[in-house]
Amino acid sequence: MKKIVSLVLLATLHAAAAAASSSATPNVPATLAKTEALAALPGGAWLALDKNALRLVGADGSERARLAVRAEGLDLRPIDGGVLAIVMDSNTERVQPVRVDLAAGVLKALPPMPEAGFGLEAACMYRDAQGLDHVFMVGPDGQAQQWLLGTEYRLVRRLALPTAVTHCRVDDAHDTLFVAEEGMGLWAFGANAEGPSARVPVALRAPYGKLAGEIEGLAVLPGGVAALDENGDLLTWRRAGASWTALPKRALGGKQLVALGGAALMVNTKQGWQAPALAWKAGTPAPRALPIVMPRMQTEPVAQLGDAADDPAIWVNPKDATQSRILGTNKKQGMLVYDLQGRETQFLPAGRLNNVDVRQDLRFGDERFDLAVATQRDENSMVLFTIDAKGQLAEAARLPTGLHDIYGTCTYRTAAGGLDAFVNDKDGRYEHWQITRAGGKFGAKLARQFKVATQPEGCVADDRSGLLFVGEEDKALWVTSAKADQPATLKMVMTVGEWLHDDIEGMGIYHGAKHSYLVVSSQGNSSYVVFDAAPPFKVRGAFRVGMDPVAGIDGASETDGLEVSSANFGGPYARGMLVVHDGFKRMPDAAQNYKAVAWDDIAKALKLED
Protein backbone atom coordinates (compact mmCIF):
# COMPACT_ATOMS: atom_id res chain seq x y z
CA MET A 1 0.00 0.00 0.00
CA LYS A 2 1.40 3.34 -1.04
CA LYS A 3 1.83 5.96 1.68
CA ILE A 4 -0.77 8.72 1.28
CA VAL A 5 0.20 12.12 2.62
CA SER A 6 -2.29 14.85 3.58
CA LEU A 7 -5.21 12.70 2.55
CA VAL A 8 -8.36 14.63 1.78
CA LEU A 9 -11.50 13.65 3.64
CA LEU A 10 -15.09 14.01 2.58
CA ALA A 11 -17.16 14.54 5.71
CA THR A 12 -20.44 15.96 4.55
CA LEU A 13 -22.17 15.48 7.84
CA HIS A 14 -22.49 18.99 9.21
CA ALA A 15 -25.63 20.75 8.01
CA ALA A 16 -24.80 21.95 4.53
CA ALA A 17 -26.60 25.24 4.77
CA ALA A 18 -25.03 26.17 8.07
CA ALA A 19 -21.58 25.19 6.91
CA ALA A 20 -21.89 27.05 3.64
CA SER A 21 -23.04 30.25 5.26
CA SER A 22 -20.33 30.41 7.90
CA SER A 23 -16.57 30.76 7.57
CA ALA A 24 -15.96 30.18 11.27
CA THR A 25 -13.35 27.51 11.91
CA PRO A 26 -14.72 24.60 13.94
CA ASN A 27 -12.92 24.06 17.20
CA VAL A 28 -10.42 21.29 16.52
CA PRO A 29 -9.19 19.81 19.80
CA ALA A 30 -5.45 20.01 20.42
CA THR A 31 -5.36 16.23 20.75
CA LEU A 32 -5.97 16.01 17.00
CA ALA A 33 -3.07 18.22 15.96
CA LYS A 34 -0.99 15.38 14.54
CA THR A 35 -3.68 13.06 13.25
CA GLU A 36 -3.10 11.75 9.74
CA ALA A 37 -6.70 11.97 8.58
CA LEU A 38 -9.65 13.78 10.08
CA ALA A 39 -13.40 13.92 9.49
CA ALA A 40 -15.93 16.23 11.13
CA LEU A 41 -19.01 14.56 12.61
CA PRO A 42 -22.37 15.91 13.82
CA GLY A 43 -22.42 17.51 17.25
CA GLY A 44 -18.83 18.67 17.02
CA ALA A 45 -17.36 15.16 17.24
CA TRP A 46 -14.43 13.97 15.13
CA LEU A 47 -13.25 10.78 13.52
CA ALA A 48 -9.46 10.67 13.51
CA LEU A 49 -7.14 8.19 11.85
CA ASP A 50 -3.71 7.89 13.43
CA LYS A 51 -0.88 5.54 12.54
CA ASN A 52 -2.18 2.72 14.71
CA ALA A 53 -5.80 3.51 15.51
CA LEU A 54 -9.08 4.97 14.36
CA ARG A 55 -10.48 7.19 17.13
CA LEU A 56 -13.84 8.73 17.90
CA VAL A 57 -13.17 12.04 19.65
CA GLY A 58 -15.72 14.28 21.31
CA ALA A 59 -16.00 18.03 20.83
CA ASP A 60 -14.07 18.52 24.07
CA GLY A 61 -11.14 16.46 22.80
CA SER A 62 -11.89 13.40 24.92
CA GLU A 63 -11.49 10.02 23.30
CA ARG A 64 -14.81 8.19 23.24
CA ALA A 65 -13.77 5.06 21.33
CA ARG A 66 -10.69 3.54 19.74
CA LEU A 67 -10.26 0.83 17.13
CA ALA A 68 -6.75 -0.54 16.86
CA VAL A 69 -5.80 -0.67 13.20
CA ARG A 70 -2.78 0.31 11.13
CA ALA A 71 -4.54 1.95 8.24
CA GLU A 72 -4.63 4.73 5.70
CA GLY A 73 -7.36 6.49 3.82
CA LEU A 74 -10.60 7.49 5.48
CA ASP A 75 -13.97 8.09 3.87
CA LEU A 76 -17.50 7.97 5.21
CA ARG A 77 -21.21 8.46 4.64
CA PRO A 78 -23.97 9.30 7.14
CA ILE A 79 -26.31 6.58 8.38
CA ASP A 80 -29.03 6.51 11.01
CA GLY A 81 -27.45 7.26 14.37
CA GLY A 82 -23.94 7.79 13.05
CA VAL A 83 -21.72 7.18 10.07
CA LEU A 84 -20.38 4.32 8.00
CA ALA A 85 -16.65 4.70 7.43
CA ILE A 86 -13.94 2.82 5.56
CA VAL A 87 -10.18 2.65 5.97
CA MET A 88 -7.51 0.67 4.14
CA ASP A 89 -5.90 -1.85 6.48
CA SER A 90 -2.15 -1.63 5.84
CA ASN A 91 -1.48 -5.10 7.22
CA THR A 92 -4.07 -7.03 5.22
CA GLU A 93 -4.38 -4.78 2.14
CA ARG A 94 -8.15 -4.97 2.57
CA VAL A 95 -10.81 -2.32 3.03
CA GLN A 96 -12.15 -2.28 6.58
CA PRO A 97 -15.69 -0.88 7.03
CA VAL A 98 -16.48 0.62 10.43
CA ARG A 99 -19.86 1.58 11.88
CA VAL A 100 -19.76 4.66 14.12
CA ASP A 101 -22.54 4.88 16.72
CA LEU A 102 -22.47 8.49 17.87
CA ALA A 103 -25.02 8.15 20.67
CA ALA A 104 -23.33 5.14 22.24
CA GLY A 105 -19.82 6.31 21.42
CA VAL A 106 -18.89 3.01 19.76
CA LEU A 107 -16.68 2.07 16.82
CA LYS A 108 -17.70 -1.33 15.46
CA ALA A 109 -15.48 -3.04 12.92
CA LEU A 110 -17.61 -4.79 10.32
CA PRO A 111 -16.35 -7.83 8.40
CA PRO A 112 -13.42 -6.80 6.21
CA MET A 113 -14.10 -6.63 2.50
CA PRO A 114 -12.69 -9.34 0.22
CA GLU A 115 -9.17 -9.01 -1.10
CA ALA A 116 -9.06 -7.18 -4.39
CA GLY A 117 -6.21 -9.26 -5.74
CA PHE A 118 -3.91 -6.24 -5.82
CA GLY A 119 -2.33 -3.85 -3.35
CA LEU A 120 -4.46 -0.88 -2.39
CA GLU A 121 -3.41 2.63 -3.40
CA ALA A 122 -6.69 4.41 -2.68
CA ALA A 123 -10.26 3.70 -1.62
CA CYS A 124 -13.37 5.87 -1.50
CA MET A 125 -17.09 5.54 -0.93
CA TYR A 126 -20.05 6.27 -3.18
CA ARG A 127 -23.75 6.45 -2.34
CA ASP A 128 -25.90 5.94 -5.43
CA ALA A 129 -29.36 7.27 -6.22
CA GLN A 130 -30.93 4.22 -4.56
CA GLY A 131 -29.11 5.00 -1.34
CA LEU A 132 -26.85 1.97 -1.74
CA ASP A 133 -23.26 2.35 -0.56
CA HIS A 134 -20.34 1.33 -2.75
CA VAL A 135 -16.57 1.23 -2.34
CA PHE A 136 -14.02 1.87 -5.07
CA MET A 137 -10.78 -0.05 -4.50
CA VAL A 138 -7.89 1.29 -6.55
CA GLY A 139 -4.59 -0.48 -7.07
CA PRO A 140 -1.44 -0.09 -9.15
CA ASP A 141 -1.29 -0.17 -12.94
CA GLY A 142 -4.85 1.07 -13.36
CA GLN A 143 -6.52 -1.84 -11.59
CA ALA A 144 -9.78 -0.95 -9.85
CA GLN A 145 -12.94 -2.58 -8.58
CA GLN A 146 -16.33 -1.31 -7.47
CA TRP A 147 -17.99 -3.19 -4.62
CA LEU A 148 -21.42 -2.97 -3.05
CA LEU A 149 -21.58 -2.70 0.72
CA GLY A 150 -24.36 -4.30 2.78
CA THR A 151 -25.07 -7.56 4.55
CA GLU A 152 -23.26 -9.27 1.69
CA TYR A 153 -20.39 -7.64 -0.20
CA ARG A 154 -20.86 -7.92 -3.96
CA LEU A 155 -18.41 -7.15 -6.73
CA VAL A 156 -20.25 -4.76 -9.04
CA ARG A 157 -17.65 -4.27 -11.75
CA ARG A 158 -13.98 -4.07 -12.61
CA LEU A 159 -12.76 -0.89 -14.22
CA ALA A 160 -9.58 0.60 -15.61
CA LEU A 161 -8.27 3.80 -14.02
CA PRO A 162 -5.00 5.71 -14.51
CA THR A 163 -1.84 3.82 -13.64
CA ALA A 164 -0.68 5.83 -10.61
CA VAL A 165 -3.72 6.92 -8.60
CA THR A 166 -2.96 8.55 -5.25
CA HIS A 167 -6.38 9.79 -4.11
CA CYS A 168 -10.03 9.33 -5.00
CA ARG A 169 -13.33 10.88 -3.96
CA VAL A 170 -16.91 10.62 -5.28
CA ASP A 171 -19.51 13.31 -5.90
CA ASP A 172 -22.66 11.32 -5.15
CA ALA A 173 -25.06 13.91 -6.57
CA HIS A 174 -23.39 13.85 -9.99
CA ASP A 175 -22.29 10.18 -9.91
CA THR A 176 -18.70 11.30 -10.51
CA LEU A 177 -15.54 9.54 -9.37
CA PHE A 178 -12.55 11.87 -9.04
CA VAL A 179 -9.08 10.34 -9.16
CA ALA A 180 -5.72 12.07 -8.81
CA GLU A 181 -3.01 10.56 -10.99
CA GLU A 182 0.61 11.08 -10.02
CA GLY A 183 2.50 13.05 -12.65
CA MET A 184 -0.64 13.76 -14.65
CA GLY A 185 -3.42 15.50 -12.72
CA LEU A 186 -7.09 15.12 -11.86
CA TRP A 187 -9.65 13.05 -13.78
CA ALA A 188 -13.42 12.59 -13.54
CA PHE A 189 -15.00 9.18 -14.23
CA GLY A 190 -18.57 7.93 -14.11
CA ALA A 191 -19.24 6.40 -10.70
CA ASN A 192 -22.51 4.76 -11.71
CA ALA A 193 -21.70 1.23 -12.75
CA GLU A 194 -24.61 1.24 -15.20
CA GLY A 195 -22.67 3.00 -17.90
CA PRO A 196 -19.25 3.37 -19.47
CA SER A 197 -16.32 4.48 -17.33
CA ALA A 198 -15.26 7.23 -19.75
CA ARG A 199 -12.88 9.80 -18.28
CA VAL A 200 -12.87 13.58 -18.53
CA PRO A 201 -9.84 15.69 -17.57
CA VAL A 202 -10.47 18.18 -14.78
CA ALA A 203 -6.93 19.57 -14.54
CA LEU A 204 -3.74 18.20 -16.09
CA ARG A 205 -0.05 18.97 -15.72
CA ALA A 206 2.08 20.44 -18.51
CA PRO A 207 2.27 19.97 -21.40
CA TYR A 208 -1.39 18.89 -21.35
CA GLY A 209 -2.67 21.56 -18.97
CA LYS A 210 -1.78 24.24 -16.45
CA LEU A 211 -1.69 22.25 -13.21
CA ALA A 212 1.59 23.18 -11.50
CA GLY A 213 2.22 20.28 -9.14
CA GLU A 214 1.02 17.04 -7.62
CA ILE A 215 -2.39 16.80 -5.99
CA GLU A 216 -2.16 15.90 -2.31
CA GLY A 217 -5.83 15.72 -1.37
CA LEU A 218 -9.39 16.04 -2.64
CA ALA A 219 -12.74 17.31 -1.39
CA VAL A 220 -16.10 17.46 -3.15
CA LEU A 221 -17.97 20.77 -3.41
CA PRO A 222 -21.51 21.37 -4.73
CA GLY A 223 -21.04 21.20 -8.48
CA GLY A 224 -17.28 21.20 -8.12
CA VAL A 225 -14.17 19.82 -6.49
CA ALA A 226 -11.31 21.17 -4.38
CA ALA A 227 -7.74 20.00 -3.86
CA LEU A 228 -4.49 20.85 -2.14
CA ASP A 229 -1.39 20.71 -4.27
CA GLU A 230 2.13 19.83 -3.15
CA ASN A 231 2.80 23.49 -2.31
CA GLY A 232 -0.21 23.66 -0.01
CA ASP A 233 -2.20 25.84 -2.39
CA LEU A 234 -5.97 25.42 -2.41
CA LEU A 235 -7.28 24.68 -5.91
CA THR A 236 -10.93 24.64 -6.92
CA TRP A 237 -12.78 23.74 -10.10
CA ARG A 238 -16.41 24.34 -11.00
CA ARG A 239 -18.41 21.96 -13.15
CA ALA A 240 -19.48 23.53 -16.45
CA GLY A 241 -21.59 20.97 -18.27
CA ALA A 242 -19.21 18.27 -19.46
CA SER A 243 -16.08 20.35 -18.77
CA TRP A 244 -14.44 22.11 -15.82
CA THR A 245 -13.52 25.70 -15.04
CA ALA A 246 -10.47 26.40 -12.85
CA LEU A 247 -10.87 29.18 -10.27
CA PRO A 248 -7.99 31.26 -8.87
CA LYS A 249 -5.79 29.29 -6.50
CA ARG A 250 -5.19 30.39 -2.93
CA ALA A 251 -1.78 30.12 -1.28
CA LEU A 252 -2.55 28.75 2.19
CA GLY A 253 0.37 26.46 2.91
CA GLY A 254 -2.16 23.74 3.66
CA LYS A 255 -1.19 20.30 4.91
CA GLN A 256 -4.62 18.73 5.21
CA LEU A 257 -8.04 19.40 3.75
CA VAL A 258 -11.37 18.55 5.36
CA ALA A 259 -14.80 19.05 3.78
CA LEU A 260 -17.39 20.25 6.26
CA GLY A 261 -20.44 19.95 4.03
CA GLY A 262 -21.96 22.25 1.46
CA ALA A 263 -19.27 24.63 0.24
CA ALA A 264 -17.35 24.76 3.53
CA LEU A 265 -13.76 23.54 3.81
CA MET A 266 -11.24 23.43 6.60
CA VAL A 267 -7.49 23.57 5.92
CA ASN A 268 -4.71 22.71 8.35
CA THR A 269 -1.88 25.25 7.93
CA LYS A 270 1.23 26.29 9.85
CA GLN A 271 -0.96 28.89 11.55
CA GLY A 272 -3.47 26.23 12.56
CA TRP A 273 -6.84 25.27 11.15
CA GLN A 274 -8.51 27.79 8.84
CA ALA A 275 -11.91 27.85 7.15
CA PRO A 276 -11.35 29.90 3.99
CA ALA A 277 -14.38 31.81 2.72
CA LEU A 278 -14.89 30.48 -0.80
CA ALA A 279 -17.88 32.60 -1.89
CA TRP A 280 -18.70 29.45 -3.80
CA LYS A 281 -21.18 29.43 -6.64
CA ALA A 282 -22.29 25.92 -7.42
CA GLY A 283 -21.57 24.61 -10.88
CA THR A 284 -23.87 22.66 -13.16
CA PRO A 285 -26.64 21.24 -10.96
CA ALA A 286 -27.15 17.52 -10.57
CA PRO A 287 -29.59 15.85 -12.97
CA ARG A 288 -33.19 15.53 -11.92
CA ALA A 289 -33.73 12.61 -9.54
CA LEU A 290 -36.04 10.00 -11.05
CA PRO A 291 -37.97 7.21 -9.34
CA ILE A 292 -36.15 3.91 -9.35
CA VAL A 293 -37.85 0.55 -9.77
CA MET A 294 -36.06 -2.73 -9.31
CA PRO A 295 -36.00 -5.59 -11.80
CA ARG A 296 -37.75 -8.79 -10.83
CA MET A 297 -35.84 -11.03 -13.22
CA GLN A 298 -32.90 -11.08 -15.59
CA THR A 299 -32.28 -13.43 -18.47
CA GLU A 300 -29.18 -15.48 -18.92
CA PRO A 301 -26.49 -13.41 -20.68
CA VAL A 302 -26.13 -13.73 -24.43
CA ALA A 303 -23.25 -15.83 -25.70
CA GLN A 304 -21.20 -12.96 -27.17
CA LEU A 305 -19.48 -10.10 -25.36
CA GLY A 306 -19.69 -6.51 -26.52
CA ASP A 307 -22.72 -4.84 -28.06
CA ALA A 308 -24.68 -8.00 -28.83
CA ALA A 309 -28.17 -8.04 -27.32
CA ASP A 310 -30.60 -5.44 -28.61
CA ASP A 311 -34.37 -5.81 -28.74
CA PRO A 312 -36.90 -7.96 -26.83
CA ALA A 313 -40.44 -9.00 -27.67
CA ILE A 314 -43.08 -10.85 -25.65
CA TRP A 315 -45.19 -13.80 -26.77
CA VAL A 316 -48.19 -14.36 -24.47
CA ASN A 317 -49.28 -17.98 -24.05
CA PRO A 318 -53.07 -17.69 -24.47
CA LYS A 319 -53.77 -20.79 -22.38
CA ASP A 320 -51.29 -20.20 -19.55
CA ALA A 321 -49.63 -16.80 -19.45
CA THR A 322 -47.07 -18.04 -16.92
CA GLN A 323 -45.66 -20.14 -19.77
CA SER A 324 -45.16 -17.14 -22.03
CA ARG A 325 -41.87 -16.42 -23.77
CA ILE A 326 -39.48 -13.51 -24.13
CA LEU A 327 -37.73 -13.19 -27.47
CA GLY A 328 -34.44 -11.34 -27.68
CA THR A 329 -32.18 -10.54 -30.59
CA ASN A 330 -28.45 -11.17 -30.58
CA LYS A 331 -26.96 -8.85 -33.19
CA LYS A 332 -24.00 -11.16 -33.65
CA GLN A 333 -25.77 -14.51 -33.74
CA GLY A 334 -29.54 -14.80 -34.06
CA MET A 335 -32.73 -15.14 -32.04
CA LEU A 336 -32.91 -16.15 -28.38
CA VAL A 337 -36.01 -17.33 -26.54
CA TYR A 338 -36.41 -17.26 -22.74
CA ASP A 339 -39.04 -18.34 -20.25
CA LEU A 340 -40.32 -15.90 -17.63
CA GLN A 341 -37.60 -17.03 -15.22
CA GLY A 342 -34.96 -15.84 -17.70
CA ARG A 343 -33.81 -19.30 -18.75
CA GLU A 344 -32.93 -19.78 -22.38
CA THR A 345 -35.32 -22.24 -24.00
CA GLN A 346 -34.35 -21.92 -27.64
CA PHE A 347 -31.73 -20.45 -29.94
CA LEU A 348 -32.16 -19.91 -33.66
CA PRO A 349 -28.92 -19.06 -35.56
CA ALA A 350 -30.59 -16.64 -37.95
CA GLY A 351 -27.62 -14.28 -38.31
CA ARG A 352 -27.34 -10.60 -37.40
CA LEU A 353 -30.84 -9.82 -36.20
CA ASN A 354 -31.38 -6.29 -34.92
CA ASN A 355 -35.01 -5.65 -33.91
CA VAL A 356 -37.94 -8.01 -33.36
CA ASP A 357 -41.68 -7.62 -32.83
CA VAL A 358 -44.51 -10.10 -32.23
CA ARG A 359 -48.19 -10.18 -33.17
CA GLN A 360 -50.61 -12.99 -32.34
CA ASP A 361 -53.80 -14.54 -33.73
CA LEU A 362 -53.11 -13.30 -37.23
CA ARG A 363 -55.50 -14.34 -39.98
CA PHE A 364 -54.44 -15.43 -43.45
CA GLY A 365 -57.55 -16.90 -45.00
CA ASP A 366 -58.47 -19.95 -42.93
CA GLU A 367 -55.03 -20.09 -41.30
CA ARG A 368 -54.10 -18.56 -37.95
CA PHE A 369 -50.57 -17.68 -36.91
CA ASP A 370 -48.55 -16.08 -34.16
CA LEU A 371 -45.61 -14.41 -35.91
CA ALA A 372 -42.38 -12.67 -35.00
CA VAL A 373 -40.71 -10.33 -37.49
CA ALA A 374 -37.01 -9.45 -37.18
CA THR A 375 -34.66 -7.34 -39.28
CA GLN A 376 -31.66 -9.21 -40.74
CA ARG A 377 -28.81 -6.76 -41.25
CA ASP A 378 -26.57 -8.84 -43.52
CA GLU A 379 -29.36 -9.45 -46.01
CA ASN A 380 -31.39 -6.24 -45.50
CA SER A 381 -34.40 -8.48 -45.13
CA MET A 382 -37.27 -9.30 -42.80
CA VAL A 383 -37.13 -12.72 -41.16
CA LEU A 384 -40.49 -14.23 -40.20
CA PHE A 385 -40.78 -16.79 -37.42
CA THR A 386 -43.88 -18.79 -36.59
CA ILE A 387 -44.59 -19.40 -32.89
CA ASP A 388 -46.45 -22.56 -31.90
CA ALA A 389 -48.75 -23.14 -28.94
CA LYS A 390 -45.81 -23.94 -26.65
CA GLY A 391 -43.79 -20.89 -27.60
CA GLN A 392 -41.41 -22.67 -29.97
CA LEU A 393 -40.16 -20.59 -32.88
CA ALA A 394 -39.46 -21.77 -36.41
CA GLU A 395 -38.11 -19.70 -39.25
CA ALA A 396 -40.81 -19.32 -41.90
CA ALA A 397 -39.52 -16.84 -44.48
CA ARG A 398 -36.90 -14.26 -45.42
CA LEU A 399 -38.47 -11.36 -47.23
CA PRO A 400 -36.31 -8.82 -49.09
CA THR A 401 -36.76 -5.08 -48.65
CA GLY A 402 -35.66 -2.06 -50.65
CA LEU A 403 -33.39 -0.80 -47.88
CA HIS A 404 -29.60 -0.69 -48.06
CA ASP A 405 -28.80 -0.61 -44.33
CA ILE A 406 -31.79 -2.07 -42.53
CA TYR A 407 -32.12 -1.30 -38.84
CA GLY A 408 -35.32 -1.29 -36.80
CA THR A 409 -38.77 -2.80 -37.16
CA CYS A 410 -42.21 -2.89 -35.57
CA THR A 411 -45.44 -4.61 -36.56
CA TYR A 412 -49.13 -3.74 -36.70
CA ARG A 413 -52.11 -6.07 -36.47
CA THR A 414 -54.75 -4.62 -38.75
CA ALA A 415 -58.44 -4.46 -37.90
CA ALA A 416 -58.99 -7.44 -40.20
CA GLY A 417 -56.36 -9.49 -38.39
CA GLY A 418 -53.63 -9.08 -40.97
CA LEU A 419 -50.00 -8.19 -40.34
CA ASP A 420 -48.14 -5.09 -41.47
CA ALA A 421 -44.43 -4.56 -40.84
CA PHE A 422 -42.52 -1.29 -40.70
CA VAL A 423 -38.77 -1.42 -41.33
CA ASN A 424 -36.31 1.44 -41.40
CA ASP A 425 -32.89 2.29 -42.76
CA LYS A 426 -30.10 4.25 -41.08
CA ASP A 427 -30.60 6.95 -43.71
CA GLY A 428 -34.07 7.70 -42.29
CA ARG A 429 -36.22 5.80 -44.79
CA TYR A 430 -39.19 3.73 -43.68
CA GLU A 431 -40.90 1.02 -45.70
CA HIS A 432 -44.40 -0.19 -44.82
CA TRP A 433 -44.95 -3.79 -45.88
CA GLN A 434 -48.15 -5.85 -45.85
CA ILE A 435 -47.40 -9.48 -45.08
CA THR A 436 -49.16 -11.88 -47.43
CA ARG A 437 -49.62 -15.63 -47.66
CA ALA A 438 -50.30 -17.65 -50.80
CA GLY A 439 -49.57 -21.23 -51.73
CA GLY A 440 -48.43 -21.99 -48.21
CA LYS A 441 -45.73 -19.32 -48.33
CA PHE A 442 -45.36 -15.89 -46.78
CA GLY A 443 -44.66 -12.85 -48.89
CA ALA A 444 -44.72 -9.07 -48.60
CA LYS A 445 -46.26 -6.21 -50.55
CA LEU A 446 -44.91 -2.67 -50.28
CA ALA A 447 -47.71 -0.34 -49.17
CA ARG A 448 -46.07 2.99 -48.25
CA GLN A 449 -42.75 4.75 -47.85
CA PHE A 450 -41.84 7.77 -45.76
CA LYS A 451 -38.73 9.30 -44.24
CA VAL A 452 -37.35 11.10 -41.20
CA ALA A 453 -34.41 13.46 -41.55
CA THR A 454 -31.82 11.44 -39.63
CA GLN A 455 -31.25 7.93 -38.28
CA PRO A 456 -34.26 6.17 -36.77
CA GLU A 457 -34.56 2.79 -35.06
CA GLY A 458 -37.31 2.27 -32.53
CA CYS A 459 -40.97 2.34 -33.47
CA VAL A 460 -44.23 0.89 -32.19
CA ALA A 461 -47.73 0.60 -33.62
CA ASP A 462 -50.84 0.83 -31.46
CA ASP A 463 -53.20 -1.85 -32.75
CA ARG A 464 -56.16 -0.25 -30.98
CA SER A 465 -55.79 3.35 -32.13
CA GLY A 466 -54.01 2.79 -35.42
CA LEU A 467 -51.19 5.16 -34.47
CA LEU A 468 -47.55 4.58 -35.33
CA PHE A 469 -44.86 6.12 -33.10
CA VAL A 470 -41.44 6.66 -34.67
CA GLY A 471 -38.18 7.56 -32.96
CA GLU A 472 -35.61 9.72 -34.72
CA GLU A 473 -32.67 8.84 -32.48
CA ASP A 474 -30.96 12.21 -32.02
CA LYS A 475 -33.93 14.47 -32.70
CA ALA A 476 -37.50 13.66 -31.75
CA LEU A 477 -40.41 11.31 -31.22
CA TRP A 478 -42.99 11.40 -34.03
CA VAL A 479 -46.46 9.97 -34.62
CA THR A 480 -48.35 9.12 -37.79
CA SER A 481 -51.01 6.69 -38.95
CA ALA A 482 -50.16 2.99 -39.04
CA LYS A 483 -52.87 2.34 -41.62
CA ALA A 484 -51.78 1.57 -45.16
CA ASP A 485 -54.59 3.62 -46.72
CA GLN A 486 -53.69 6.79 -44.81
CA PRO A 487 -50.97 9.35 -45.61
CA ALA A 488 -47.81 8.99 -43.52
CA THR A 489 -47.84 12.56 -42.25
CA LEU A 490 -45.43 12.86 -39.33
CA LYS A 491 -46.40 14.98 -36.34
CA MET A 492 -43.93 15.74 -33.59
CA VAL A 493 -44.69 14.39 -30.12
CA MET A 494 -41.54 15.59 -28.33
CA THR A 495 -38.01 16.66 -29.16
CA VAL A 496 -34.86 15.55 -27.40
CA GLY A 497 -34.45 17.73 -24.32
CA GLU A 498 -35.90 17.75 -20.82
CA TRP A 499 -37.37 14.26 -20.86
CA LEU A 500 -35.87 12.44 -23.84
CA HIS A 501 -32.07 12.23 -24.01
CA ASP A 502 -30.61 10.93 -27.24
CA ASP A 503 -30.63 8.31 -28.41
CA ILE A 504 -34.37 7.70 -28.53
CA GLU A 505 -34.50 3.92 -28.75
CA GLY A 506 -37.00 1.18 -27.86
CA MET A 507 -40.76 1.71 -27.59
CA GLY A 508 -43.73 -0.25 -26.34
CA ILE A 509 -47.43 0.34 -25.62
CA TYR A 510 -49.16 -0.76 -22.43
CA HIS A 511 -52.93 -1.21 -22.67
CA GLY A 512 -54.63 -0.84 -19.29
CA ALA A 513 -58.32 -1.19 -18.56
CA LYS A 514 -58.98 2.50 -19.27
CA HIS A 515 -55.63 4.04 -20.16
CA SER A 516 -52.91 3.19 -22.65
CA TYR A 517 -49.31 4.30 -22.17
CA LEU A 518 -46.34 4.67 -24.48
CA VAL A 519 -43.00 3.70 -22.92
CA VAL A 520 -39.84 5.03 -24.60
CA SER A 521 -36.19 4.25 -23.87
CA SER A 522 -34.27 7.48 -23.25
CA GLN A 523 -30.86 5.96 -23.81
CA GLY A 524 -28.81 9.09 -23.15
CA ASN A 525 -29.66 9.14 -19.45
CA SER A 526 -30.62 5.46 -19.03
CA SER A 527 -34.24 6.20 -18.21
CA TYR A 528 -37.68 5.27 -19.49
CA VAL A 529 -40.27 7.95 -20.26
CA VAL A 530 -43.99 7.19 -20.04
CA PHE A 531 -46.51 9.11 -22.18
CA ASP A 532 -50.23 8.84 -22.64
CA ALA A 533 -50.62 6.86 -25.86
CA ALA A 534 -53.44 9.17 -26.98
CA PRO A 535 -53.26 12.85 -27.92
CA PRO A 536 -51.98 15.19 -26.60
CA PHE A 537 -49.48 12.51 -25.46
CA LYS A 538 -48.99 13.92 -21.99
CA VAL A 539 -45.80 12.92 -20.18
CA ARG A 540 -46.68 10.86 -17.10
CA GLY A 541 -43.13 10.71 -15.80
CA ALA A 542 -39.88 8.83 -16.15
CA PHE A 543 -38.05 6.21 -14.13
CA ARG A 544 -34.86 4.20 -14.01
CA VAL A 545 -34.29 0.50 -13.40
CA GLY A 546 -32.00 0.06 -10.42
CA MET A 547 -30.27 -2.92 -8.90
CA ASP A 548 -31.65 -5.49 -6.48
CA PRO A 549 -28.65 -6.52 -4.38
CA VAL A 550 -30.62 -9.15 -2.46
CA ALA A 551 -31.64 -10.96 -5.64
CA GLY A 552 -28.25 -10.29 -7.22
CA ILE A 553 -29.74 -8.48 -10.23
CA ASP A 554 -28.05 -5.33 -11.49
CA GLY A 555 -29.88 -2.38 -13.00
CA ALA A 556 -30.49 -1.58 -16.65
CA SER A 557 -28.77 1.11 -18.67
CA GLU A 558 -28.19 2.31 -22.23
CA THR A 559 -31.28 0.37 -23.26
CA ASP A 560 -31.76 -0.27 -26.95
CA GLY A 561 -35.03 -2.14 -27.28
CA LEU A 562 -37.92 -2.76 -24.92
CA GLU A 563 -41.36 -4.34 -24.86
CA VAL A 564 -44.29 -4.08 -22.49
CA SER A 565 -47.45 -6.12 -22.03
CA SER A 566 -50.50 -5.80 -19.79
CA ALA A 567 -51.16 -9.56 -19.75
CA ASN A 568 -51.51 -11.24 -16.37
CA PHE A 569 -48.33 -13.31 -16.19
CA GLY A 570 -48.96 -14.24 -12.56
CA GLY A 571 -47.11 -13.41 -9.36
CA PRO A 572 -45.58 -9.93 -9.41
CA TYR A 573 -46.55 -9.60 -13.07
CA ALA A 574 -50.32 -9.71 -12.51
CA ARG A 575 -50.62 -6.26 -14.11
CA GLY A 576 -48.08 -7.03 -16.80
CA MET A 577 -44.36 -6.59 -17.34
CA LEU A 578 -41.78 -4.44 -19.04
CA VAL A 579 -38.75 -6.14 -20.59
CA VAL A 580 -35.70 -4.01 -21.41
CA HIS A 581 -32.30 -4.57 -22.94
CA ASP A 582 -29.42 -3.92 -20.52
CA GLY A 583 -26.36 -2.41 -22.15
CA PHE A 584 -24.06 -3.10 -19.18
CA LYS A 585 -24.36 -6.36 -17.28
CA ARG A 586 -22.87 -5.87 -13.81
CA MET A 587 -22.65 -7.64 -10.46
CA PRO A 588 -20.59 -9.31 -11.85
CA ASP A 589 -19.47 -8.15 -15.29
CA ALA A 590 -20.85 -10.36 -18.04
CA ALA A 591 -22.30 -10.27 -21.54
CA GLN A 592 -25.46 -8.23 -22.06
CA ASN A 593 -28.88 -9.52 -21.13
CA TYR A 594 -32.51 -8.50 -20.64
CA LYS A 595 -34.29 -7.38 -17.47
CA ALA A 596 -37.97 -7.76 -16.53
CA VAL A 597 -39.81 -5.18 -14.41
CA ALA A 598 -43.28 -5.63 -12.93
CA TRP A 599 -45.71 -3.06 -14.34
CA ASP A 600 -47.23 -2.77 -10.89
CA ASP A 601 -43.92 -1.36 -9.63
CA ILE A 602 -43.84 1.19 -12.45
CA ALA A 603 -47.46 2.18 -11.90
CA LYS A 604 -46.86 2.76 -8.21
CA ALA A 605 -43.70 4.78 -8.85
CA LEU A 606 -45.42 7.08 -11.37
CA LYS A 607 -48.95 6.90 -9.91
CA LEU A 608 -50.41 5.52 -13.14
CA GLU A 609 -54.01 4.41 -13.46
CA ASP A 610 -55.04 1.23 -15.24
Regions flagged by a language model, labelled:
Residues 20-610:
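Sequence/structural signature of beta-propeller domains
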Residues 1-20:
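Gram-negative bacterial Sec-dependent N-terminal signal peptides
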